[in-house]
Amino acid sequence: MNYQFHHVGIPTTEVRPGERYSAPFKMYTSGGEAPTRIQYHRFEEGCPLHPLLQTKPHVAFKVDSIDEAIRGKNVILEPYFPFEGFKVAAIEENGWPIEFIETSLSEEEIWGGSAYKNSVIYPESE
C-alpha cells in the first residue's frame, strides 16, 4: 500500500476567511490552498460526522485502494464520494482519526474548487 500525504485537517471554533459551508455535514471548511495543505473545519451542532473528526486533528493520505486501506480497521467514516472522482473514508487508530482518499483528480482540480460544484458535500455551490 502506498500512502501519499494529502492534507491535515484541524477542528476549530473560530470563523475563518474563505469558509465553504456544507449543509449536509453542518460543517465549514477553509484553507488547504497553501503547499502545506492545512484545512480548518468548523462544525455546527448536530453535525453527523464522528466525534473524533469534530474534535481531533486528522491527517489525510491518498491511497491506491480505500478498501484495502480500511480493511480490518475501526472505520469511523464509511467510504463515499463527496464529489465525483474523489472517494473518502476515515478510520480511528490509537484514538486519532486518519482519512484516506482514492482519486484520479489532479491537485488543481481538488484544491481549485471546480470539483465541488453541485456535489454531495457542497450541493448548493455555484
Stretches found by the model and what they are:
Residues 1-33, 38-51, 74-126:
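Vicinal oxygen chelate
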Residues 9-11, 60-64:
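Short hydrophobic/aromatic beta-strand micro-patches
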Residues 56-58:
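Short active-site oxyanion
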Residues 62-66, 103-105:
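Beta-hairpin (beta-strand-turn-beta-strand) motif
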Residues 66-73:
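Short amphipathic alpha-helices within nucleic acid-binding modules
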